[in-house]
């Protein structure tokens, strides 16, 4: 149902004689998605090229005001020619008004954006401030600077405004596709999320067997997308930011109808035919840490429980990564540790060093930690540790010392004996244990220290 269809631009020195523009280039309204109330704004590029002026911005702001009152998500569709030059500072003030409304709504109601045309300059901040953003693969273009304005760049060499470039590099795009694909994803996302920060995470009923055996889990550790699909209700896994930092997988699963956010280390990406498409080291990267941190912060804001699948043995060691990794690692550690939502960690493979600690370990606040029988938890690989501790030993002695070290220091049983693992489980039983853990943690309450906010 459309709202504000009679709104038009005010007269200015440069458009006194201009014809009236229907809806001032943006259509706003409210509707239902699977029975859930949502508020929508959609820019109309056929009217004033979809440019943002004073009244255009006020219409979008009014959508946010209504959504905040009703506790309902906001969905925006962008196709914009930029700022309306005729309205000068009034139009700039409109940009600021939209930014402010998005910031005020952050962590209160979900914000979702679809870019179906141009989204350039200051307007690119709008999808970046949203919780989830999508770009239409052929017509959608998102940029701060146009590709031909970037020093040293050529359009034919690198189209930095293209959907594929933005999806792989900027960290705020959750997916690209056709308009129909994007709308379908948005509808699915709305159905999975709480409507607001006080909404219930039980967003669906469950007819899937809660004790269903996941017999192929042990073979899926390399690509957690398959593992998460296997353990979820009806095998549904909704991935976010799928093209960005592929070595860190984020998305949503369902466990007994409860929406759970998932963060997982990934070493292999398989294609639709089950063949290896990409491979990564079991190491944390700056992009991956930032991706995980942002996702965990969103989940915590809406009290969505978080599940981590840990399989990591260190950090990416290259010059580019070293420039950013410490800050990104701190951000991810802060996000996990400060989150008060239910947190469960499942160690599926290796868990070595401070990379393991940062991945939602017991040490930084995980409520429950499970591990598979063949998981390895410790300072580092046992053979490397033996070589460091016994530098003059021959190969046979190194192997013997490594075996002793692994048994005493790096085995899952030794970690469990010290309380760092709550239970060692069989991969086939993963689903039933996770369902039970999150059911138990549903009423979790944390009396956090009083403060304005943290600094990371």
What name fits each language-model region?
Residues 1-456:
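Ligand-binding clefts of soluble mixed alpha/beta catalytic domains
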């Amino acid at each position: 149902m459309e709202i504000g269809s009679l709104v038009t631009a005010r007269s200015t020195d440069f458009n006194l004689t201009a014809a009236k523009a229907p809806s001032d280039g943006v259509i706003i309204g409210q509707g239902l998605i699977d029975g859930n109330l949502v508020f929508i704004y959609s820019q109309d590029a056929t009217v004033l090229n979809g440019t943002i002026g004073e009244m255009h911005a006020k219409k979008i702001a009014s959508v946010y005001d209504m959504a905040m009152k009703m506790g309902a998500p906001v969905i925006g569709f962008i196709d914009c020619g930029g700022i309306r030059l005729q309205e000068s500072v009034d139009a700039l003030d409109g940009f600021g008004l939209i930014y402010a409304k998005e910031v005020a709504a952050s962590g209160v109601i979900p914000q979702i954006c679809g870019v179906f045309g141009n989204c350039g300059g200051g307007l690119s901040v709008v999808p970046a401030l949203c919780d989830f953003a999508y770009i239409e693969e052929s017509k959608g273009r998102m940029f701060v600077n146009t590709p031909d304005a970037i020093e040293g760049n050529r359009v034919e060499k690198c189209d930095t405004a293209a959907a594929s470039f933005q999806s792989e590099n900027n960290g705020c795009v959750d997916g690209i596709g056709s308009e129909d694909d994007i709308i379908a994803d948005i509808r699915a996302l709305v159905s999975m999320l709480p409507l607001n920060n006080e909404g219930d995470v039980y967003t669906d009923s469950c007819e899937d067997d809660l004790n269903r055996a996941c017999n192929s889990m042990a073979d899926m550790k390399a690509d957690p997308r398959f593992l998460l699909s296997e353990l979820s209700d009806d095998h549904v896994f909704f991935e976010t930011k799928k093209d960005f930092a592929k070595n860190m997988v984020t998305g949503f699963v369902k466990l007994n109808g409860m929406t759970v956010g998932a963060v997982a280390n990934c070493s292999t990406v398989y294609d639709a035919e089950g063949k290896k498409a990409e491979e990564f080291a079991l190491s944390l990267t700056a992009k991956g840490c930032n991706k995980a941190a942002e996702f965990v912060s969103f989940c915590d804001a809406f009290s969505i429980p978080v599940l981590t699948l840990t399989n990591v043995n260190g950090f990416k060691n290259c010059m580019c990564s070293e420039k950013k990794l410490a800050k990104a690692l701190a951000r991810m550690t802060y996000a996990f540790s400060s989150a008060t939502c239910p947190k469960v960690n499942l160690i599926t493979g290796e868990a070595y060093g401070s990379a393991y600690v940062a991945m939602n370990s017991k040490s930084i606040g995980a409520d429950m930690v499970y591990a598979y029988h063949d998981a390895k938890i410790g300072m580092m690989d046992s053979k490397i540790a033996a070589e460091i501790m016994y530098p003059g030993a021959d190969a046979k002695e190194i192997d013997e010392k490594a075996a002793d070290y692994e048994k005493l220091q790096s085995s899952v049983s030794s970690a469990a004996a010290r309380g760092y693992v709550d239970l060692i489980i069989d991969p086939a039983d993963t689903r039933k244990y996770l369902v039970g853990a999150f059911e138990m943690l549903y009423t979790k309450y944390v009396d956090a220290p009083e403060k304005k906010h943290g600094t990371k």
